[in-house]
Amino acid sequence: MKDHEIIALFFERSERAITELMGKYGAAIKNVASNILKDAQDAEEAVSDTYLTVWNRIPPEEPKYLGAYSCRIARNLSLKRFHANTAQKRNSYYDVALDELEETIPALSTVLA
C-alpha cells in the first residue's frame, strides 16, 4: 500500500491505518528505537508510543513521506526516553558509594573521644 493510501486511512480514522503502517514501516521504526534504547522493553514501548503519536497527529498533519515522518517520531520519543533513563541514573554511583562507606565508618558510640 502506498503512503498516500495509508495517510487516507488515518484521515478516515480507520484502525487499518496502524496495521498498514506496521506492515510497511514497522521494522524501520523498531530499528530506530532499538538502536537508541538498548533495553528491548523500552524500545517496544517507544514503538507503541510512536504508533499512538502518529495516530494522534494525522490528521491534521499530512506528511509527504510517511516512513521518514514515523521514524523521526520514533527517534524523538526514543531519545526522550533515553535521556530520562540516564538522568535518573546520573548520581546512582554516588548513592552506592555512600551506602558502602556508611558500612565502613564506625558508629559514633564506638569512637573514643
List each language-model region with its residue ranges:
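Acidic, Ser/Thr- and Pro/Gly-rich low-complexity regulatory segments
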Residues: 1-3
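Arg/Lys-rich amphipathic alpha helix in sigma70-family domain 2
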Residues: 75-93
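Structural recognition of an alpha-helix C-terminal capping motif at a helix-to-coil junction
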Residues: 31, 45-52, 56, 64-76
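Short alpha-helix-to-loop micro-motif enriched in aromatics/charged/Gly
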Residues: 58-64, 85, 89
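Solvent-exposed, non-membrane alpha-helical residues enriched in polar/charged side chains
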Residues: 7-8, 19, 30, 34, ...
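Acidic, proline/glycine-rich intrinsically disordered inter-domain spacer in sigma factors
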Residues: 99-113
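Amphipathic, Lys/Arg- and hydrophobic-enriched alpha-helical face
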Residues: 22-40
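Short loop-to-helix capping motifs
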Residues: 13-14, 39
